[in-house]
Amino acid sequence: PAEALTDSEFAAIYKEAQKYVGTPYVWGGSTPETGFDCSGYVCWVYNQNGYDVGRTTANGLWNKSQHISEAEAKPGDLVFFEGTYDTPGKSHVGIYLGNGMMVSAGDPIKYANIHSSYWQKYLSGFGRLSK
């Protein structure tokens, strides 16, 4: 199985991720210059940290990740949601920060509690990427 990130690996991912908090949501956006959608943001952050995930959708990231339980989820893993809009499969992805918190490209990119009344009803799984 894929290993959880070390503290220093997570620190590097978090440092990149927090640079863009407050950036507006842009459908299809995948760079700091264009703005980000949820999967564009996650792909950018991980690609900048030595991963090779390319540019894919939330469902594509789900397919590239090892599926883990919430109890196994560690900071730097991905958290997935279904039904946030009308698309088959996973419709939203965020970077799990631990303690029920994530950072993701809503409008704008922001921190959120995955167990809030909104996110809890769409929560559908956790994944761990491998380098």
Task: Identify the role of each PLM range.
Residues 1-24, 121-131:
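Intrinsically disordered, low-complexity
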Residues 23-75:
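Catalytic cysteine-centered active-site loop
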Residues 31, 83-85:
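Structured beta->alpha junctions
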Residues 51, 67-70, 85, 89-131:
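Aromatic- and glycine-rich peptidoglycan recognition patches
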Residues 78-80, 95:
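Hydrophobic beta-strand signal
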